[in-house]
Amino acid sequence: MGSRVLTVAALTVTASVLVTGPTALADPNAINPIAGLNGTFGLPQLHGRAQAVAQVTGMSSPNMTQNVTMIGTDLGIMWDNGRGEVLTAFGDTAGVGVPNLLQGSLWSWRSNAIVRSNDRNLADGMNFDSVVKDAVGQTKEVVPSPKIPFVEISRIPTAGVAVGDTQYLNLMSVKNWGPAGTWDTNFSGLAASTDNGENWAALPETHRPSAGGDRNFQQSAYLKDNGYVYQYGTPPGRSTLGHVARVRDADITRLGEYEYWTGKDWKKGDPAAAAPIVDGVGEL
């Protein structure tokens, strides 16, 4: 595969690791998103070379996302939309609004949400230029989820990429939450948008069931290089093995066209052939 792609893989995985570590809670119903009331104050204290400079969402954020019912958010998945704008897809998003009582949440809970930014100076944080909203003015759940335990409790984005004028999100269908750092998925799959993230259509033909070799691609990260989209994947959960596949840009929705790195070469159409390239991945 070459040292270049292996290096990129390591960087991609490193950039995707949660700073909260493998024991952080995943279940959004178990989390109070209001700073102060949940025992968190100010910015997180990081112990590596990176330092927190500003909150992006929440009541202490300069984006004032509480005004669109976005007080607490899951991972923010960022990618270039192909025109120099950064789109961010957040996972489970909570705010003060109409509660999802039947789904076990006291908060207005959406499984995913999209914001856009043209900010070029991130030294003081990332300012949002627009938010994808629903009919009542809160952040819109762009790919709906029934939020029924052991059916589908959430549909969470794990990777995004632009191919031509189309935006693609890879999302995992969470079946249920397990102990800290673990969960089960039904499948992962793509959704597509042709209007810069405003509206999305799920693509069932891209579903990877959480079994066999496809289980190693339930959570993803993308890299584009030389006409290919490289997909780095892990099983559901944290502290897992990383794998890599690739596909021609134009074939991103055609699972049969994906090639999988075996440790020696690329094998087409067989996700079970993908060999681990890295261990201990925090979360993609």
Where are the language model's segments positioned?
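Secretory targeting and sorting signals
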Residues: M1-A26
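A generic alpha-helix preference that emphasizes hydrophobic side chains
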Residues: G21-T23, L75, P157, L241
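Beta-rich carbohydrate-recognition and catalytic domains
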Residues: N29-I71, D80-I153, A162-G212, G233-L284
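Conserved beta-strand position repeated once per blade in WD40 beta-propeller domains
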Residues: L75-I77, P157-A159, Q219-A221, E283
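Flexible gly/pro/ser-rich segments immediately N-terminal to CXXCH heme-c attachment motifs
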Residues: R208-D225
